[in-house]
Amino acid sequence: MAQINAVYYVSDSNEFIEEKAEKMATGLTAKPWQEMPEAEKQESFAYKGKVVSINEDPSYGEGSIVTISFPVAYEVPDFPSILTTTYGRLSYEPNVKLLDLQFSNDLVERFPGPLYGIEGIRDLVEVEGRPLAMSVAKGAIGRSIDSFHEQMLAHSYGGIDIIQDDERLFEHNWTPYEQRVPAGLAAIAEAAERTGRTPLYVVNLTGKTFELKERAREAIGLGAPALMLNVYAYGIDVLQGLREDPEIDVPIFAHSSLTGMMTRSKQHGIASRLLLGKLLRMAGADAVLFPSPYGRIGINPEEAQRVKDQLTMTTQMKRAFPIPSAGIDFQTIATVRQDFGEDVIINLGGSVHRYKGGVEAGGKAFIEALNSAN
């Protein structure tokens, strides 16, 4: 039977931690264990959560690191079942944080993982040997499709590798899919005649949950070379469903909107390394935007590195691009490259738009700074 080891930080006093850990293990699976007749206990024992270890970690201060093993009894494992099993009832506990889920290999193999990953995206943009440069089509909300075209043109002339829709650019009457995707691609093609380069346009996929697959197919039919999803606004299972659809055969970028309420507390919620790293890679994200450690809304540097490690470590799945975002400017580029290495997408949005010479000049300055930040 497949197994999941769930790792928790329990910030309660260590005095009764053994009892609490056992209640956590049984409460998520075979509750109420103590009240079961002996015959029922024997039937349920194979499916009962079991405490594997209880340790202290000085880096977390007071409290304990508790590891519980859960058998996976369902035939087709899915993220809703897994998260409900390992953290469903515990999410009401104010002093328990889920740090990691350690999956047995046979369980990992049942999830799709990235379709393109780092190597595939590099092939699309034809850039090797340095981090990729990404910017965002900001300020498009409420403005005409002609204005959007001009902004995409400026980004393309500036030499940006990847141009992403703003995550708040939804289906508006001033920038509907049917006009926005062709306008963006036309701007890229126009600039390519002069630059010889074709940046990757990442189209924000929005709409009602049960319409997303059809919306994705429509966008791809219009020529969209990549898509972005605000994953946790919909649910991680939605990302997996998109990735497993053979007709949705373009890279999918995962945005971390809404996850702050789940990750920010040290004592409660789900760790960024798991929520934004391991799970999104398993579900099929080719690249993941997450708060950089450099801005006011950023995660701490150690956790940012753990997110990167979960996305890029060698496993049976393709590696996914980390995209630390927010709080990055021209002065931070060298630091990002030093901290995250070559296999990172550096997302510079506001600084490119605010550049004194405009977006095109900002893009060129971005590439120049990136190339000089060795």
Curated annotation (Swiss-Prot):
Catalyzes the enolization of 2,3-diketo-5-methylthiopentyl-1-phosphate (DK-MTP-1-P) into 2-hydroxy-3-keto-5-methylthiopentenyl-1-phosphate (HK-MTPenyl-1-P). Belongs to the RuBisCO large chain family. Type IV subfamily. NCBIfam families: PRK09549.1. It is an enzyme of class 5 (isomerase). Has no RuBP-carboxylation activity. Binds 1 Mg(2+) ion per subunit. The keyword Metal-binding applies. Homodimer. Signal peptide: none annotated. The keyword Metal-binding applies. Substrate binds at K138, Q164, D165, D166, E167, H255, G327, G349, G350. Its cofactor is Mg(2+). It comes from the Bacteria. GO terms for molecular function: 2,3-diketo-5-methylthiopentyl-1-phosphate enolase activity; magnesium ion binding; ribulose-bisphosphate carboxylase activity. Its EC number is 5.3.2.5. Pfam families: RuBisCO_large (PF00016). Keywords: Amino-acid biosynthesis, Isomerase, Magnesium, Metal-binding, Methionine biosynthesis. It comes from Shouchella clausii (strain KSM-K16). PANTHER family: RIBULOSE BISPHOSPHATE CARBOXYLASE (PTHR42704), RIBULOSE BISPHOSPHATE CARBOXYLASE LARGE CHAIN (PTHR42704:SF17). It catalyses: 5-methylsulfanyl-2,3-dioxopentyl phosphate = 2-hydroxy-5-methylsulfanyl-3-oxopent-1-enyl phosphate. This is Putative 2,3-diketo-5-methylthiopentyl-1-phosphate enolase. One of its GO terms (biological process) is L-methionine salvage from methylthioadenosine. Pathway: Amino-acid biosynthesis; L-methionine biosynthesis via salvage pathway; L-methionine from S-methyl-5-thio-alpha-D-ribose 1-phosphate: step 3/6. InterPro entries: RuBisCO, RuBisCO_lsu_C, RuBisCO_lsu_C_sf, RuBisCO_lsu_N_sf. Mg(2+) binds at D166.
